[in-house]
Amino acid sequence: MQITRPHNFETFIGQKNLISTLKAMIESSKKQNKVLNHILFYGMPGMGKTSLAGIIANETKNKIHFIQGSNLEKKSDLINILSVINENDIVFIDEIHSINKNIIEFLYSAMEDFVFDLIIGTESNAKALRMKIKPFTLIGATTKINEMAQPFKDRFGYIARFVSYNAEDMKQIIRNSIKLLNINLGEEHFDFVASYSRNTPRIVNHLLERINDFAIVKNAGIIDKKIIKKTFKSLDLYEYGLTKDHVEYLQLLRDGFDSKPVSLDTLSGVLIHPKEVLVNEIEPILLYLKLITKTSKGRMISSKGITYLLKEKLIW
C-alpha cells in the first residue's frame, strides 16, 4: 500500500496557524457566499503545499485543476484553462514562479476582475475585447517566492509561508504513515528516523518506504535499528539526512579553501551545480543546522560544520 495524501484538515499534521487562517477564510467565504480569495503558498519542497491545496478543494467541495507553472508559456494556455472552469473552481499552479514572465500581467485582470482583456486582429484592424470568466480561486505554490514580481504577489489575498516541522509533528507523520504502509516500526525508532528526514514530510515518507523494502528483503520483514541504519547507508545518507551533495559542499569549504570564505560562483563552478541548486536545495539545511555561515565575502564552514565532518569520519 502506498502512502496517500491527507484529505482533510484533521489529518494534515503541522502548520497550525496557517490552517487556522484557511479555516476562517473558507468559513467566511461560505457565509458570505463569495469566492474564496486567491492564496499563495511558499516554502521548501515536500512540505505539503500541494496536499493542502487538495484539502482546500475537499473542504469547499469544489473541483481543483492541477497545473505546472512551466507549462504556461502563452496567453492561449491560460485562456484554455480558465475559459472552461466552473464557478468557484480552484486552479492550483505548482511552481507558479516558473510561468512565462511575458504572460504574468495577462493573469492580473483574471485574478482581480475575472476577465481577460484581449486584442483581436493586428495594427489598424486591432480591436479590444473583454472576455468574462467564471469566478475562481487561484492557489499558487512556489519554492522561489523571490522570483515572483511584487504586483503578482499583491493579487493574492493570503500569502502563507510553510514553516519547518518540529519533532512532534514528524513523529505524528511517521505514526500515520506506518499505519497506511502496514509496517511494524516501534516508537523507539521514531526519533532516529525523523532525524534523517530534514524535517520534511515527503522525505520521511520516502524513508519509511525504503526501510520497509529493506526489512522485507533483508530481515524477514522485521524493522530494527540495524536494518534502519543499513537502509540509510545504502541510500548514502549521513546524520541529519545529509546527502553526498551536502557533504561534498562541506568538504570543499573545509579542505578546498582552508575554511576561508568562498563565493557562490566559485562553489557552483567547482561542484558543477547551478547556483540555484546550491541556494535552494543544498544550503538551506546546512544553514538551518548552522554547519555553514554566510558572510559578505562568501560562504564559510562553521566550527560546528567541521565537528560534523570529523564525527562522520569524513575528514581527518
Curated annotation (Swiss-Prot):
The subcellular localization recorded is: Cytoplasm
Q: Where is this region: Head domain (RuvB-H)?
A: 239-316
Q: Report residues binding Mg(2+).
A: 50
For this chain, one GO molecular function annotation is: ATP hydrolysis activity
Listed under catalytic activity are: ATP + H2O = ADP + phosphate + H(+)
Residues engaged in binding DNA: 294, 299
- Gene Ontology annotations for the cellular component aspect, listed alphabetically: cytoplasm; Holliday junction resolvase complex
- Sequence positions that bind ATP: 5, 46, 49-51, 112-114, 155, 165, 202
Region listing for Small ATPAse domain (RuvB-S), in residue ranges: 166-236
Q: Cite the EC number.
A: 3.6.4.-
Q: What class of enzyme is it?
A: hydrolase
A Gene Ontology biological process noted in the UniProt record is:
DNA repair
Record region (Large ATPase domain (RuvB-L)): 1-165
Where on the tree of life does the source sit, at the highest rank? Answer: Bacteria
Q: Which UniProt keywords apply?
A: ATP-binding, Cytoplasm, DNA damage, DNA recombination, DNA repair, DNA-binding, Hydrolase, Nucleotide-binding
User: Which NCBIfam families does the entry mention?
Assistant: PRK00080.1, ruvB
Q: What is said about its interaction partners and assembly?
A: Homohexamer. Forms an RuvA(8)-RuvB(12)-Holliday junction (HJ) complex. HJ DNA is sandwiched between 2 RuvA tetramers; dsDNA enters through RuvA and exits via RuvB. An RuvB hexamer assembles on each DNA strand where it exits the tetramer. Each RuvB hexamer is contacted by two RuvA subunits (via domain III) on 2 adjacent RuvB subunits; this complex drives branch migration. In the full resolvosome a probable DNA-RuvA(4)-RuvB(12)-RuvC(2) complex forms which resolves the HJ.
HAMAP family from the UniProt entry: DNA_HJ_migration_RuvB (MF_00016)
Domain remark in the UniProt entry: Has 3 domains, the large (RuvB-L) and small ATPase (RuvB-S) domains and the C-terminal head (RuvB-H) domain. The head domain binds DNA, while the ATPase domains jointly bind ATP, ADP or are empty depending on the state of the subunit in the translocation cycle. During a single DNA translocation step the structure of each domain remains the same, but their relative positions change.
Family per record: Belongs to the RuvB family.
The job of this chain, per UniProt, is described as: The RuvA-RuvB-RuvC complex processes Holliday junction (HJ) DNA during genetic recombination and DNA repair, while the RuvA-RuvB complex plays an important role in the rescue of blocked DNA replication forks via replication fork reversal (RFR). RuvA specifically binds to HJ cruciform DNA, conferring on it an open structure. The RuvB hexamer acts as an ATP-dependent pump, pulling dsDNA into and through the RuvAB complex. RuvB forms 2 homohexamers on either side of HJ DNA bound by 1 or 2 RuvA tetramers; 4 subunits per hexamer contact DNA at a time.
The protein in question is named: Holliday junction branch migration complex subunit RuvB
Species of origin:
Mycoplasmopsis synoviae (strain 53) (Mycoplasma synoviae)
Organism taxonomic ancestry: Bacteria, Bacillati, Mycoplasmatota, Mycoplasmoidales, Metamycoplasmataceae
Query: What would be the name of the gene that encodes this protein?
Result: ruvB
